Design a protein with these regions (language model features):
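Hydrophobic transmembrane alpha-helical segments in integral membrane proteins
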Residues: 1-19
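Non-cytosolic membrane-interface motifs at loop->transmembrane helix junctions
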Residues: 5-6, 38-43, 70-81, 104-115
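Core segments of alpha-helical transmembrane spans in multipass integral membrane proteins
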Residues: 13, 17-26, 41-69, 83-91
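Cytosolic, membrane-interface loops and tails of multi-pass inner-membrane proteins
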Residues: 25-44, 99
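Individual transmembrane alpha-helices with interfacial aromatic-anchor signatures
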Residues: 46-51, 83-85, 108-121
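Hydrophobic cores of alpha-helical transmembrane segments in multi-pass inner/ER membrane proteins
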Residues: 55-60, 118-125
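Transmembrane alpha-helical segments of integral membrane proteins
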Residues: 89-102
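Juxtamembrane boundary at the C-terminal end of a transmembrane helix
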Residues: 124-132
Length: 132
């Protein structure tokens, strides 16, 4: 059985994969074409927010890969960060399941299942670390 620190490192690898999967999204979802009718400020805010979300996910991955023992320690900072990460990923589960249109989820069933399982896994790992 893996230690909690090892599970956190696995979670870091999962977060890294999520971040990497988001990199080609602008092309795949045709951001430029789909945002063409939006005002310039809306396009700019959209691109900035999308980039920052990916940056944050990469930051979570780095935190998990480089400092797993701190996150698993049960000390206040580790518990706080683990709680935040657990809540962040927990909130992502219902977004995946209920916010995105069912038809789009069906068209991309494998990706939908992989991401949903990943978000649930991350919630559990960081939830366990938060309760130590």
């Amino acid at each position: 059985m893996l230690s909690l620190s090892a599970w956190i490192q696995v979670a870091g690898a999962v977060q890294l994969a999520i971040g990497l999967a988001n990199l080609p999204l602008a092309i795949r979802l045709q951001y430029r074409r789909n945002l063409a009718g939006a005002s310039e400020i809306v396009r700019q805010v959209f691109y900035v927010h999308a980039a920052y979300i990916v940056l944050v996910v990469f930051g979570f991955a780095a935190l998990s890969l480089l400092f797993p023992t701190d996150l698993a320690s049960g000390r206040p900072l580790g518990r706080f960060l683990s709680t935040f990460l657990a809540i962040f990923w927990l909130l992502r589960v219902p977004i995946q399941l209920f916010y995105y249109p069912a038809e789009i989820r069906r068209q991309n069933r494998l990706a939908d299942v992989v991401f949903t399982v990943a978000f649930a896994f991350l919630t559990v790992v960081f939830g366990v670390a938060a309760t130590r």
